[in-house]
């Protein structure tokens, strides 16, 4: 930990400079991504376009500016993702001087695990859930109604689902953090499972569109992830490990 204390104004000046670097990197990344916005858009919305293609349909733009501004949003999203290393580096450079060595060592595993879980959730949603969700929506076509999905709305829905599944997969890390900090114990986590399930379904309803299919496909993995997090918390439970070590020492003392 750096013992040199800086005035609050210097901290704010440094923070402003680092935010400028992050925003500049995002703008550059978005500018480069705009050249490939059509390809990026096509990849992100492949599950939706595949569902529409089954009935011979395709995405529509109902406003003169819709295609252009949707591609800009797509480029900004891509620029944000591509420049995440710059964002993390600037965050680290800002907070590292105020951390102890033990805290610095814990940051890297935390960043790696949280990034991996978020990416895993996004990939799971994209590859497994998105096709089912869009097929479900498209299945309501009939002789009186034909689906006419706009690219703006489908892009918005897709990004919301990406965010929902990415955040949902952070649940084991959050549960583990609560355990190792002593806020809750593994026993309390397992005992509170019914309440956790209720909260998960409420959160799932808030993060997803108002249909039961996408809510279920988000809530069920979240319940499993909660139980996985509680299991990991049980394995690393400080009280359990301390009791186990005390019992081992007692057995050694008896054998002597």
Where are these regions (language model features)?
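Membrane topogenic/interface segments and analogous intrinsically disordered interaction regions
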Residues: 1-256
């Amino acid at each position: 930990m750096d013992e040199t204390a800086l005035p609050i104004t210097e901290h704010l000046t440094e923070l402003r400079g680092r935010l400028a670097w992050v925003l500049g990197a995002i703008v550059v990344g978005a500018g480069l991504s705009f050249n490939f916005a059509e390809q990026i858009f096509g990849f992100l919305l492949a599950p939706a376009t595949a569902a529409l293609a089954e009935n011979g349909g395709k995405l529509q733009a109902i406003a003169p500016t819709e295609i252009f501004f949707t591609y800009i949003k797509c480029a900004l999203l891509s620029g944000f993702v591509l420049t995440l290393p710059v964002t993390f580096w600037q965050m680290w450079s800002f907070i590292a001087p105020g951390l102890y060595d033990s805290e610095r060592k814990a940051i890297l595993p935390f960043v790696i695990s949280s990034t991996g879980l978020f990416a895993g959730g996004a990939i799971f949603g994209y590859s497994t859930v998105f096709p089912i969700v869009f097929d479900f929506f498209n299945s309501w076509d009939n002789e009186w109604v034909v689906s006419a999905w706009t690219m703006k709305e489908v892009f918005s829905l897709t990004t919301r689902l990406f965010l929902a599944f990415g955040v949902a997969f952070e649940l084991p890390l959050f549960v583990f953090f609560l355990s190792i900090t002593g806020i809750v114990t593994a026993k309390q986590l397992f005992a509170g499972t019914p309440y956790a399930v209720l909260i998960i379904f409420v959160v799932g309803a808030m993060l997803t569109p108002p249909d039961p299919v996408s809510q279920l496909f988000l809530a069920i993995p979240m319940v499993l992830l909660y139980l996985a997090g509680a299991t990991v918390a049980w394995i690393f439970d400080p009280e359990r490990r301390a009791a186990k070590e005390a019992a081992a020492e007692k057995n050694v003392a008896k054998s002597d």
